[in-house]
Amino acid sequence: MKVIVPMAGRGSRLRPHTLTIPKPLVPVGGKPIVHRLVADIARLCEEPIEQIAFVVGEFGAEVEKELLAVAESLGAKGSIHYQLEALGTAHAVMCASEVLDGPVVVAFADTLFKADFKISAEDQGILWVKQIEDPSAFGVVKLNEQGQIIDFVEKPQTFVSDLAMIGIYYFKDGARLRKELQYLLDHEIVKGGEYQLPDALRRLTEDGLTFKPGTVEE
């Protein structure tokens, strides 16, 4: 199993802390957010974590050294990849394209969670979601009668679903995701000037991949 952690965003919602410390390195309970995130994934995931790929901005050598140490502390190889322009979530994941091979978890670094993180051999894809009261500020998923995810809607203005994506995804075949991300880039499929991960997810479902929702307690 490999883990990709996109974390190049500015973290403006956590200012003033993020004026001096990148958002994922802001400490929560004595540990940086990103350390807690990947440690929780490693603890809950039954399959060993081989590699953790951090997608960063211009954070500097000391931050990169700290991130590699986080990976090493979990028994995984660490790697650094760069997203130097804010071109969206799909672009961020694609910045670590060489890691998209075999089973992959994508976990955006501003997410802290308590979740059911069980992955079975039959699972093609899992998106962890949380039921919320006001979904208009989030990306949400629609389910069919079998409980499978069939659509992704970003910040719905009319009610579509109350299941918000929390920013953690599992793909059994990372190469399949890489193909769809490359399609977005090649055809310049953008929204608001950014390449969005849900557009790649939608293409995967249209191609027959089955996503199921993972549950989050908090």
Which ranges hold each PLM region?
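Conserved N-terminal catalytic core of the sugar/cofactor nucleotidyltransferase
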Residues: K2-V5, R13, L19, V26-P27, ...
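Short N-terminal binding/cap micro-motifs at the start of the first secondary-structure element
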Residues: G11-P16, S136
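A structural signal for short hydrophobic beta-strand segments in well-ordered beta-sheet cores
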Residues: L25, V141-L143, P213
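The conserved acidic donor/metal-binding loop of glycosyltransferases
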Residues: A109-L112
